[in-house]
Amino acid sequence: MNAPGARWPVAALGPIARARALAAAVPGAASAEGVLDAPYDVAWPWVADLEHSVPRFDAQVRALRVLERRPHGDAEELRIRATSFGVSLPFTVRLENGFCLMQARRRLYLVVMAAEPVEEGARTRFFHMEAVPLPGTRPLRRHLRRAVAADLRNLTRLASSGF
Amino acid sequence: MPPPPGRSAGGPRAGPESGEPLAGPAPLVGVELVRAARRGDAAAMDALVRELMPYVGRVCGAIALDRGDDAMQETFVAVLRNLHGLREPAAVHGWVRRIAVREAIRVARAARTEVLDPGALDRGAAPAVDLDAVVDVRSALAGLSPEHRAVLVLREVDGLSEAEVAGLLGVAEGTVKSRLHRARAAFARRWAR
């Protein structure tokens, strides 16, 4: 049964399932998920342009600057700075087609975004998670829930208007 | 994104060029990766998922079949949530295997529709067929219960001994032998149709 030609069924973990698994395990994570009324081929490249997209759909990020980017296998590794509430925080980012993980220095903050085509690519399922994965930050969770829900609403509106 | 705790608005702000460089230590692998993930490093948790993905995909796909993707997500939720309970990081693959098999059986049982009763299958001698010649095994696997698929996968794909399979599934070795025999027989019968 182990012949090279044998095709045992193989399961897959899509970007959203991967992000959900992380969200389920990271303490204090808040997440939101929805369907954007925009083709995946339009929505994801727009989101993946972090410098322009994040400050537009995340009202709490005033600016995001990419300092360095380099290919890393099928992904890209980025070094960025995001400014929020007057605080500028460095992040290391892993960016793939449909998946983005942004982790701040010393793990002070975590952002995960994932997307997959639905309806044959005509629309886009989007998953967004943020967390302050540090002890004693549970009270922040309610705020985070509101923040990620607002981000998703903004993104939905932007997608509906063609970005 | 709100500011992290302990940082107030208007606090000290480093210049944009002072972030951590990408160049640094070699990528974490194996035990170090597991340790970093256990410490709550989300990038390490994700890297661990990517490293384990091909193996877990094979186990969940072969046992849970059409629900394999769901089983895979459940496996990684359980793996990441319980990493702190993994006493020996070097044993991560065996530990993940156990979780993947458990989750795949659970998901497959929940979704189970039409499954043949292995007890009703040929109880004769094990088939003298070259099962290595099998190309498309999904339809054959679909006729087995999740528990029988688990035994088959662990023995034939993972190469575990019957004793190891018994230990992993928490059943007697004789039960493994019996399930394996029936699974192989059923597999061959369906393939011969």
Give, region by region, the residue ranges found by the protein language model:
Chain A
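A short, structured loop/turn motif at beta-sheet edges
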Residues: 37-41, 71-72, 94-96, 115-125
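Beta-strand elements of well-folded, non-transmembrane domains
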Residues: 36-38, 84-86, 117, 132-134
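Hydrophobic ligand-binding cavity/cleft-lining segments
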Residues: 1-71
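Short, surface-exposed coil-to-beta transition loops
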Residues: 29-31, 86-90, 107-113
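Hydrophobic pocket/interface hotspot
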Residues: 43-54, 80, 93, 126, ...
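Short, hydrophobic/aromatic-rich segments at coil-to-beta transitions
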Residues: 71-80, 94-103
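A generic beta-sheet turn/junction motif
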Residues: 84-86, 95, 106, 119
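Beta-strand/loop substructures that line and gate deep hydrophobic ligand-binding cavities in soluble
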Residues: 101-161
